[in-house]
Structures are given as structure tokens and as C-alpha cells.
């Protein structure tokens, strides 16, 4: 390809890199349109209203004004891209049908602003995107043709995979995405962990797993934002994020379509693994837009060890 992993000798922009990936023009166009939309989202994050919108999403959660605005930005860009037939957003109650014609088109599921409640305290947030070929969004995550996230932190970075390596781009002063890391790979074992959920609600197996990680010398690194926490695990190449089943919440908190599938697709293609404690996240057949699942995601050996503890419990 263009460079060794983690190195970029020349300024390679997103579109040029996508053209090297042996994918069709429509998919290149779609990913670039999402990247363009993110430029408006980051502007909204930096300057937008931090109050509530007075509405709720399909999970009954109160929507922030930034959630609604970010969703509107992303949805409008997807509709006018000309290559999308169905859209599902964490902020919408049902699938938005752009066209009944699925020939050569894609369906997109996304979380427009994951971690939006962290904006008012100036912590990192992000956009998460899952792309399927055709009009069926309720497929196993393994059938995704692409997945990506955009992290809005001190720098704005975009990470994507189309099934052939995981690559990072960083927004420059001209708001262009240039390649900064190529073919990112996870190590087999890690030394950081990001545990979500209240620990006093953990099941016995998860509590024992946490004690195992602590005894191993793993460092706790948790921001409360799914995108920055996954980004840390991926970029360090060593670690684990977990949001397990909790007492009273057997399916955990995170959404399969909008959060888990795209992140699992990215991590697996970087040499990592993702499971709900029993089977790979990417093998779960979704039954609805609002489906949730526990997750253990990161280095293969840590994920396998988590499964052992969960299975024993």
C-alpha cells in the first residue's frame, strides 16, 4: 500500500486512499459524504446549543439539541448522496426509506453524536457509522461492507475499514482528512481496560474478571465515551473495553446496530475480537432497531479470558 503501519510519507487524502481499496465508486462516494457531514457536526459541537431539545428518542432518553442537530446534518447528507436506500439513526424511531430501489445502493445505521452528554464538560465525543449493501439493515454485523467512526477530540480523526485493514485520517487546518496511520493492528494481549456500568451491579463472573485484570496490572482508562475509549484501545493496540450485562439490565446498555456492530467490525479487522460473552458480536442476528447487547471488545486474549469468566458464572 502507501506506507508502513503508522507512517505516512506523503499527504494522502481520504478519497485517494479509498480508491486504492478495490471498492465501487458508490461506496467511495458514500464514505466521503459522511466525512463531509462530520465537518458540520464538529462545528455544531464547538458552537451549538448545549441544552435539551424537549424530545426523546426510541429508547425514551431525553434528546439534547446537539443530538437532534447532528442527526439532521447526517441524515440530510445521506439522503442527498444518491447512493443510500435506507437510513437508521439512534435518534429516529424507525427506518427512513429514501428509495425502494436497492440496486447498487447502501443502507446506513449511525449514531450521529455518541456521548453527547459529555460535550458540556468538554470531553471527546464521536459519530459511529455502519454500512450494508442493499436495503436490509437487520443483518448480522459480519455482513457490513464498511464501518467507520469520527472522533471529535483535541484533533478530529476518522477511522474506517472496508474489510481490508483499518486506517486513520486526521483533519488538517483546511478541514481535509489526511492519512496518519495505515493498517492499524491490535496486539494479542493488553494492559489497559475501560469498564462501563456500575460495578456494584456486575455479575459474579464480571467482577472476577475485573479482579483478574487488576491483578495483571492493567490500568483503568475510562472516559464515559464509547468512541474515545474504543479509539484509545485501538490506537494503543492493547487493551479492552467492556460494558457487561448488569443486574437489572441483562442486555447491557449499548446498541447493537448503532454502536456495537461498527466498532466490532473495525476491531476485528485490526486483529482484535468482540463478543457478548457467548458469541461474536458480528454473529448476532438483530431482531429490531433498539436491540442491545453486552460487549467485551479489544485484544483477542483479553476477550477470550472475559468469555471464560462469564461462561463460568
UniProtKB/Swiss-Prot annotation:
Q: Name the principal localization, coarsely classed.
A: cytoplasm
Q: An example of a Gene Ontology BP annotation on this entry?
A: sucrose biosynthetic process
Cofactor list = Mg(2+)
Question: For this protein, what does the record note about how its cofactor is bound?
Answer: Binds 2 magnesium ions per subunit.
Q: Which UniProt keywords apply?
A: Carbohydrate metabolism, Cytoplasm, Hydrolase, Magnesium, Metal-binding
Q: Which GO MF terms are attached to this record?
A: fructose 1,6-bisphosphate 1-phosphatase activity; magnesium ion binding
This one is known as Fructose-1,6-bisphosphatase class 1
The similarity annotation says: Belongs to the FBPase class 1 family.
Residues involved in substrate binding:
114-117, 222, 253
Native organism taxonomy? Bacteria, Pseudomonadati, Thermodesulfobacteriota, Desulfuromonadia, Geobacterales
Q: Binding of Mg(2+) 1: at which residues? A: 90, 111, 113
